[in-house]
């Protein structure tokens, strides 16, 4: 069992959640039940699954939850692309957050591979 609070992948994903909430607060109000909700849920799913997986007694089970976290990060990345296409964000913000997501995906993948 791992202490999720000490995992860099968890702390970085918590930072990403904060950033996504701040970003989506700038979106049009008509997106409240659309992209805003979807992006926030995808972002929250990343650290939540890391934390839940850390309680599992086997590394195989933990790795499965890390795969779910990676899937949520890919969902978030897709939604970020949509927000760029809709011009809710500019390309600089997009690139900055996308790079953050990609770094996190790589970190989670490396950690998962070490468990297996």
Label the predicted regions.
Residues 1-116:
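Amphipathic alpha-helical assembly/interaction segments
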């Amino acid at each position: 069992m791992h202490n999720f609070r000490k995992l860099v992948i968890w702390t970085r994903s918590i930072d990403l959640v904060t950033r996504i909430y701040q970003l989506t607060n700038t979106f049009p109000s008509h997106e409240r039940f659309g992209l805003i909700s979807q992006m926030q849920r995808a972002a929250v799913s990343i650290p939540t699954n890391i934390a839940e997986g850390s309680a599992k007694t086997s590394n195989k089970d933990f790795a499965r939850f890390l795969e779910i976290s990676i899937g949520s990060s890919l969902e978030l990345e897709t939604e970020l692309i949509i927000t760029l296409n809709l011009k809710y964000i500019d390309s600089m913000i997009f690139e900055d957050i996308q790079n953050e997501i990609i770094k996190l995906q790589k970190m989670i993948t490396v950690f998962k591979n070490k468990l297996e």
